[in-house]
Amino acid sequence: MRIEEDLKLGFKDVLIRPKRSTLKSRSDVELERQFTFKHSGQTWSGVPIIAANMDTVGTFEMAQALAGFDILTAVHKHYTVEEWATFINTASADVLKHVMVSTGTSDADFEKTVQILALNPALNFVCIDVANGYSEHFVQFVAKAREAWPTKTICAGNVVTGEMCEELILSGADIVKVGIGPGSVCTTRVKTGVGYPQLSAVIECADAAHGLGGMIVSDGGCTMPGDVAKAFGGGADFVMLGGMLAGHEESGGSVVEENGEKFMLFYGMSSESAMNRHVGGVAKYRAAEGKTVKLPLRGPVGNTARDILGGLRSACTYVGASRLKELTKRTTFIRVQEQENRIFNSL
């Protein structure tokens, strides 16, 4: 046993220090980025935000809506091959360019992903997702996926430390998914005692990944547009959002009514709700590591997307970054004990 005494920070622990700027308007900020990925060799351009691969966020409807904002969607892994075929037949080439195919690490998951990718060559992204990316089996699966799909861009996770980030990139991942426990409906940290403050995880993993020519996506912990800006400021190439995109018309959650008001269910993918729905319940040897919440219906996701992108543009103007690419170089974090004046928050 040992104790590391280095301070680790989350998004709530910092603010971004403003700097002189020559920008006249938020409209001068370019949020689109262009990436060429290390292993696949593919080039992609767009706004580097990803809707999370949760079945109450990463839906086909969400992909259709967010493609209009140049945003990616990691479509959840519980759609059947037949449902994928129907979606692909109706979706435009531009929508498919903004879609990630999500998979687990079982043999059945692999075979299903092979079938989905064979439906259309425009499906260029694969998201290999497990809660704990530190297992040897996971690393071997990433290597197997890279061998099977040499020209597909592979996103794999989740991990929170530099050495494992490097391991996944060397095994074939183009993008490493960073985050253990920060999600709004994740209870891993309280159930297991395991985790890592998200901002520090992003900073450390970005440093490791970029040294090898890889990239990272910050997954979890964003509760407002300012957190998205902080993630990019900390070095994230992409930011994945779950809770911020839940509760919308396109989110796919079940709608319940209480006292005449409608709510949408949103749950973590390791929650009892998710396991009851997809695997017939919580196995005897494990505990649920997620919760279920009821969110007021929030209307079309486009309104939220505009709010997030507007906040991101504004953050860039405050530090003089004319392009999102420059935000990291222009960011200085200051440690704080408060984020906002909360006097009227209860009203």
From Swiss-Prot:
Record keywords, A-Z: Metal-binding, NADP, Oxidoreductase, Potassium
GO biological process: purine nucleotide metabolic process
Family annotation (SMART domains): IMPDH (SM01240)
Record GO cellular component, one term: cytosol
EC number(s) per entry: 1.7.1.7
Binding site for NADP(+): 108-131, 216-239
Active-site residues per Swiss-Prot or TrEMBL entry: 186
One GO molecular-function entry: metal ion binding
Task performed by this protein: Catalyzes the irreversible NADPH-dependent deamination of GMP to IMP. It functions in the conversion of nucleobase, nucleoside and nucleotide derivatives of G to A nucleotides, and in maintaining the intracellular balance of A and G nucleotides.
Family from the record: Belongs to the IMPDH/GMPR family. GuaC type 1 subfamily.
Stated name of the protein: GMP reductase
The organism of origin for this protein: Salmonella gallinarum (strain 287/91 / NCTC 13346)
